[in-house]
């Protein structure tokens, strides 16, 4: 491993630790902040994939219609950290409706991708209740780059460690913890 990769590994570890600490300071336990981070990571990664597809289409002089565009794109709402209460209100209200509503006027439509999003976001929730805290977590997640191989490898290692922490913190639960199948399937399908 070279120095640049090792340095980025440490940065990514610190980013995730900061996000976890922020969620923990709000009273969110390990089991719930793993879920919280998973859906935030997913939206950030999806936005990066959309940006990449948009750029590729531009090179071919073709139009690309983003599935989460305008105010619904991570690259738009996640930058609103100067107004954290507005950001949290937007995510809990408008964005969540966009991600979960089967109504084509309110949601993403009724095609396969929209149905995948609904399956994911119908089964998770936003545990942040304070705008300032939520904005700090979003700022940390925004520092990650899912198009960077080092970030993805380190995040997968960190995710495994977080799952171990959840297992250790959850004395009442037995067995191993796994990422829910619908989340794995959706992530694979979106990436493909």
Model-derived regions, located:
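Non-catalytic, mostly N-terminal accessory regions of nucleic-acid modification and defense proteins
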Residues: 1-191
């Amino acid at each position: 491993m070279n120095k640049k990769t090792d340095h980025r590994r440490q940065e990514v570890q610190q980013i995730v630790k900061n996000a976890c600490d922020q969620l923990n300071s709000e009273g969110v336990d390990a089991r719930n902040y793993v879920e919280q981070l998973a859906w935030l990571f997913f939206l950030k990664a999806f936005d990066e994939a959309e940006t990449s597809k948009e750029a590729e289409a531009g090179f071919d002089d073709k139009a690309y219609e983003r599935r989460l565009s305008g105010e619904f794109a991570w690259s738009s709402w996640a930058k609103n950290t100067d107004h954290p209460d507005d950001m949290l209100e937007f995510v809990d209200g408008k964005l969540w409706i966009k991600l979960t509503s089967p109504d084509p006027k309110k949601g993403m439509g009724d095609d396969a991708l929209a149905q995948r999003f609904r399956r994911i976001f119908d089964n998770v929730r936003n545990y942040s209740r304070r705008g300032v805290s939520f904005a700090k977590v979003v700022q940390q997640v925004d520092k990650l780059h899912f198009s960077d191989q080092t970030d993805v490898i380190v995040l997968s290692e960190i995710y495994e460690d977080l799952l171990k922490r959840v297992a250790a913190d959850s004395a009442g639960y037995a067995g191993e913890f796994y990422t829910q199948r619908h989340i794995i399937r959706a992530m694979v399908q979106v990436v493909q």
